Amino acid sequence: MSVTFEGQIDSVLGGFYCLRGYATFRELSSYSKADPSYQRDLISEHKNEMRDFLKKGSYVFFPEIILSYSIKTKNNLLLSQIISANGRNTPLKINKNKTTLTLKDEEKLDRIDGNHRLEAFEKNKGILDNFKVPFCIILLDGSEDDLKKKNIIFHNINFKQIPLSKEKSLAILFK
């Protein structure tokens, strides 16, 4: 069975085209997969914490789940050419007010950030099935550099930020 993701498309810093929108946990979980070449091993304790946080339902908020999709064309068009042609002859359809990406039956998006959240959902199906969550699908051009790009994006998301100290975190919570 195919699925269609809908949202807005634009170019962001670094020249990546992104499709941003909302989908249910079920859709994102069912139509995406973790790539073991850059994803960290799941920490059971963290997965359980995430499950409890999601089930509690109080102040539940988190940033977009970041995924990627490689658009491969017969004549190796550049992504900018595909966008300029409104996605013609690709799974991407670009209109003035919305863009859709339709995946074929067995096709999956690659998870870049949000794997722990999606894994927590998979352990609690039924409870969170229809909760909508924000997503960002980074569009790639299907070149042999796609894996390198995903590795770098994963690294930049997970290792470039300055961790919040426990003391600072508690101070913010109890102000």
Located regions from the model:
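Basic- and aromatic-enriched surface patches that contact anionic nucleotides/nucleic acids
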Residues: 61, 67, 71, 79-175
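N-terminal extension/subdomain marker
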Residues: 1-102
